[in-house]
Every structure is written in C-alpha cells, then in structure tokens.
C-alpha cells in the first residue's frame, strides 16, 4: 500500500509494459516512424495500467495521470515539436468535455477518467476524438450486453469503470485510425 491508501501499481505496471511490448509489432506496422512508435507504446503502458487499476480499485491514481501527461508532452516536444500546441489544445478540450460530463452527473464519471482523457488528448491530438468515440461505442456495446443478460432494471445498477474502454478505444485508434 502507498501512503495515499492505494495499492502499489508495480504489478499492473509490469503487466501493462508486457502488453505494450506484445502490441508493439502491430503498432510498428501502423506507425510511420520511431517518433510515432515510442509515444504510442508509452501511451499504451499508461492506459493499460490505468485500466487494470480501475478494474481492481475503481480509482486511477493521480501519479499515473500526471506522469502520463508529462511524458506525452515531453515525447511530443522531443519527436514532433510542431505538434506540441495541438496536443496541449486537445488535452485541454478532451479534459473540459469529460469534466463537464462529470459535473453534470456527479458519481457517473470519476475525475481519474477526466484526467486520463487529458493524457489521451495529449498523446493523440485530433485523433483523441476518434479514440473517445471508439471508447464510448465499446462501452455502449458492453452495457447493452449486460442489459440483455441481466435485464434493463438490473443493468442500470451496474457501474462500469471507464478506463478499460478508454484504453481499448485508444489502442484501436493507434492501430487502425489515428
């Protein structure tokens, strides 16, 4: 346990790195250069760690989202300096969209999800819109499957963590559409 009461993410981080390494050959096929591959792999590490943590604890640590945001901006500045302003803009826009959603319906969307969305915006820029659309589509399909399996009344009581869907949507965007 860490001082903030959250479990240490070491095991999840190692698993996330393994998943990112396994996905790297697929990313390499879709990435035009190392300048795209390294940030994509770093993003996947952050996203899969967040997804596993969210599934296990229903929380996304500030350390993870804060470090993820800094790493994404630093990698952009290093490899694609002309895109830093765009990435910061989309990090802000996606953050604002998710924050508005969290404020409209308190308890429906956690602030960890809001901050994780900013990491996605910083990493993907304009393609973050596609990633979020994929994430919500996948989440809607899973929600519909739960509703079919449990019945609508019981399905409404099920709270799904969003980070796994954000990770899946971003991975699909990296592999096929971003």
Task: Spell out what each predicted region is.
Residues 1-178:
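A membrane-topology feature that recognizes alpha-helical transmembrane segments
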